[in-house]
Amino acid sequence: MNKHASLIHPTAVIAPSATLAPDVQIGAFTLIGNDVQIDTGTIIGSHCTIHGPTRIGRNNRFIGQAAIGGEPQDKKFAGERTELLIGDNNTIREFVTINRGTGGGGGVTSIGNDNWILAYTHIAHDCHVGHHCVFSNNASLAGHVTVGDWVIFSGFSGAHQFCRIGRYAFIGMGTLINGDVPPFTLIGSDTLGRPRGINNEGLKRRNFTPERITAIKRAYRTLYVAGLPLAEAKQQLAEQAKDNDDIKELLQFIETAQRPLLR
């Protein structure tokens, strides 16, 4: 038995067209389907299924029982070639499901680097997840959701299709998101998805200076507390954004919203 074969449990099934780096480990009763590529350092636990076309990067850990790269749960899907792209250094826990894209939605579902995707999370077709995100147990994304870097989804939270979640946002436990969530925003733990302030603790953990946090708080008050019509709030944010990249990011997010902004 060669060295690579010794890293693959004898009960695992590897399709002929799957491509595995020499040090990839495959656990018991796992199925790796056709057109799957897995890069170096990745560990696939027991009872996982990975269907292609799927590309998985370096140093990922699939703990077990995950269903990855399955067909999209979309009645419009007609078997067209679509794919799932997963980056590096992600941890994907038990019973996670991540589906491939659809032809009508761009054809790709993508997961970035350094994400923690915890048990029973579902990431649907055509979603795009950035880097350093956390999806706590039972979080769910409907199709076509875009999630920026450093976002945290608490347990049992979810996002409606086509929503965007801006960078550094925090989604509270059990919250259902049905609109775009601006960067830096904290959404309260209720089913209505109401903004409760900025993600102050998260920004501190990411080494935002007090000055940056103060400016973001001012922008939040302009958008949510002052009672201004959105058009007027955007005018004031444009003034605040002249010398502030964080507020520029916030304003650009608002101006490119595809769904109603959570307010």
UniProtKB/Swiss-Prot annotation:
One GO CC annotation: cytoplasm
E.C. code: 2.3.1.129
Catalytic activity: a (3R)-hydroxyacyl-[ACP] + UDP-N-acetyl-alpha-D-glucosamine = a UDP-3-O-[(3R)-3-hydroxyacyl]-N-acetyl-alpha-D-glucosamine + holo-[ACP]
Biological process per Gene Ontology, one example term: lipid A biosynthetic process
Localization terms from the record: Cytoplasm
Highest rank taxon of the organism: Bacteria
Pathway: Glycolipid biosynthesis; lipid IV(A) biosynthesis; lipid IV(A) from (3R)-3-hydroxytetradecanoyl-[acyl-carrier-protein] and UDP-N-acetyl-alpha-D-glucosamine: step 1/6
Gene3D superfamilies listed in its UniProt record: Hexapeptide repeat proteins, Udp N-acetylglucosamine O-acyltransferase, C-terminal domain
InterPro entries (UniProt xref): Acetyltransf_C, Acetyltransf_C_sf, Hexapep, Lipid_A_LpxA, Trimer_LpxA-like_sf
Main localization, broad class: cytoplasm
Keyword annotations from UniProtKB, A to Z: Acyltransferase, Cytoplasm, Lipid A biosynthesis, Lipid biosynthesis, Lipid metabolism, Repeat, Transferase
CDD domains per UniProt: LbH_UDP-GlcNAc_AT (cd03351)
SUPFAM superfamilies attached to this UniProt entry: Trimeric LpxA-like enzymes (SSF51161)
EC main group: transferase
Gene Ontology terms for molecular function: acyl-[acyl-carrier-protein]-UDP-N-acetylglucosamine O-acyltransferase activity
Annotated HAMAP family: LpxA
Quaternary structure note: Homotrimer.
Function text: Involved in the biosynthesis of lipid A, a phosphorylated glycolipid that anchors the lipopolysaccharide to the outer membrane of the cell.
Family: Belongs to the transferase hexapeptide repeat family. LpxA subfamily.
Name of this chain's protein: Acyl-[acyl-carrier-protein]--UDP-N-acetylglucosamine O-acyltransferase
Natural source organism: Xylella fastidiosa (strain Temecula1 / ATCC 700964)
